[in-house]
A protein has these predicted regions:
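Surface-exposed interaction/gating patches
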Residues: 2-17, 100-167, 171-172, 211-216
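Alpha-helical scaffold segments that form or flank carboxylate-/histidine-based iron centers
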Residues: 48-52, 160
Length: 217
């Protein structure tokens, strides 16, 4: 299974129109062409003007076939022309292809608030990072009320990243969960042991996301 993450950076003021187009048209076209839809999110914190969504396919060949059919679909062209009569809605598209790690659960959502985290591993340390998550971190997350949604690695290009998603009941639950996790002696012991020969993560980025009303659950 291949997952495609797409981030649409909207033209200023056009994010509501992008969401409306997905809700009223694009999602139905995706269903028509059997494009799997994991979720659609807007940023929860900060003045964001972007939509993040993740689709799924059986393979890269399956993705190319279905995306080509969708892109050539006359009703899609008509909707796009109508919704962009006063100018384009999307200023930039950023996409990446991913596959689930061997230890990842099947992606599903218990809440509407997720956190996407991207870890750029130190050179040669990605396997050690995977081991720490599978053997320690995931269990500690669950212990502290943090939902493990999914864990991915990128499959196109030379990537040294781990992309994962967590779930929370609300922002207060996020702060409580992370506070408990970070102060847990079991985490501190696991981290110290795994970093005996140096840090595993070079750069980390995270964003808080809220499922849109039209997103699958």
């Amino acid at each position: 299974m291949i997952y495609e993450q797409r981030i649409y950076k909207a033209v200023p003021g056009k994010l509501p129109a992008i969401n409306a187009r997905f809700a009223n048209h694009t999602c139905e076209f995706f269903k028509e062409f059997d494009i799997g839809m994991l979720g659609f999110w807007n940023d929860e914190i900060g003045a964001s003007n972007q939509l993040t969504y993740i689709t799924s396919f059986e393979s890269m060949a399956d993705r190319e076939k279905k995306w080509a059919a969708f892109s050539a679909h006359k009703p899609w062209h008509e909707v796009r022309a109508e919704t962009e009569a006063n100018g384009p809605l999307v200023a930039q598209v950023i996409n990446s292809f991913m596959e689930l790690t061997s230890y990842s659960p099947k992606p599903s959502f218990k809440t509407t608030l997720q956190e996407k985290r991207v870890y750029e591993a130190m050179p040669g340390k990605l396997p050690d990072l995977h081991n720490r998550f599978s053997n320690h971190t995931m269990g500690l997350f669950e212990k502290h009320g943090i939902e493990n949604v999914a864990y991915w690695t990128e499959v196109v290009g030379t990537s040294n990243r781990l992309v994962y998603m967590l779930g929370y009941p609300d922002l207060a639950g996020r702060e409580k969960g992370w506070s408990g996790f970070q102060s847990d002696p079991a985490w501190q012991t696991a981290r110290a042991a795994s970093e005996e020969n140096g840090a595993l993560v070079r750069v980390s980025k995270h964003s808080m996301l809220r499922l849109t009303e039209y997103s699958p659950r």
